[in-house]
C-alpha cells in the first residue's frame, strides 16, 4: 500500500459530518504530517478571555508595540502551550519551516521580536494544537471528515477567525450552504 500524501503546508477544513464538536467548521494549518502522525494549528476560533498583551504579561514579556490582538484556540491538545504561525521573513533558531509557505515557532524569541517590532510581517498566536497519532488523520480523511485544500496566506492571516472556514470553502470552489452533514444510501 502506498504511503499517504503529506498534508504538510495545506489547510484542513472540517466537513459538516466530522462528528466531533471540537472541530465543527475547523480550519487547521497543517505543519507536520508523516507516517508517525500529524500536527496542525487551528486558525478559526478565538480563545476566550485572553489577548496578546495579556499573554505577554503572563510570560513577563513587555508588550511593547505589539497590537493587542486575539489569541486563537490552536486545538484541543496542550492548550497551555503557545504557537506562533508566521511568515517566512523571520526565522528563529527553533522555527519549523513549513513547505516554504510559513513557519511555526513555539519559543519566546518570536513573541519578543513581535513586541519589539522586529518580528515577522504576518503572524498569529495560538494556544494548543491539533494532533493525530500514527494513521489517525489518514483514517479521518478516508471517512471524509476533512477536506484538504491549498493554504493561501490570505486565508490564514487576513480573514477574521470566524469567517475563515467559509472563506476557505469558497476558495476551494465549494458553496458551504450546499454541504450536508449526512449522505443518503442507494
Curated annotation (Swiss-Prot):
One Pfam family from the record: DUF179
SUPFAM superfamilies per the UniProt record, alphabetical: VC0467-like
Source domain of life: Bacteria
GO cellular component terms, semicolon-separated: cytosol
Protein name from the UniProt record: UPF0301 protein Swit_2673
UniProt family annotation: Belongs to the UPF0301 (AlgH) family.
Species, as recorded: Rhizorhabdus wittichii (strain DSM 6014 / CCUG 31198 / JCM 15750 / NBRC 105917 / EY 4224 / RW1) (Sphingomonas wittichii)
Coiled coil, from the record: none
Annotated InterPro entries: AlgH-like
